[in-house]
Amino acid sequence: MSIFNNLKLGHRLALGFGLVMSLMAALTLAAYVGLSDTNDDLHSIADNTVPSLQVAADLKSTSLNLRRFEYNHLVSEDPSRLLVLEADIAKQQADLLQTFKAYEPLISGDEDRALWQEAQADALRYVSQWGAIQALSGQIGGAGKSVAEERLTGPSREYFEQLQAKLDKL
């Protein structure tokens, strides 16, 4: 400390100012590195996570619409309404399978890929149930409606719930 005491006031002030400026430079560098890392993380989220969440939400929405149209088909007694619903169902099925393809480039890891493959398999199993249900559900006033309802609330519902559980994890 005797060296510091022997310095003139101007030199002491210059040394103190130099130390403060050195600390400020170190803090600025640390802040820059921290902000750079944060920027990289934000770009990763914006470029990968947000689009994959949007597509996953689209998958969920499409599958829920598909299920709603199936139930509407089951309760409808109007032949022209049945035709409209069948077209809506076919469109939703195609949209669902197409949206699965749109999700593939957004897959970010092995776990995500495995979950996507399982969800896609569940979607195919679920969609494949509709053919038999449609034939029975279209029988107006017949016993086919009750059999269609059993299938819609049985195996089809099971596949639908499995699909929804996977989509919730995507």
What are the residue ranges of the model-derived segments?
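Polar/charged, Q/E/K-enriched amphipathic alpha-helical segments with strong coiled-coil propensity
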Residues: 42-46, 71-87, 97, 101-170
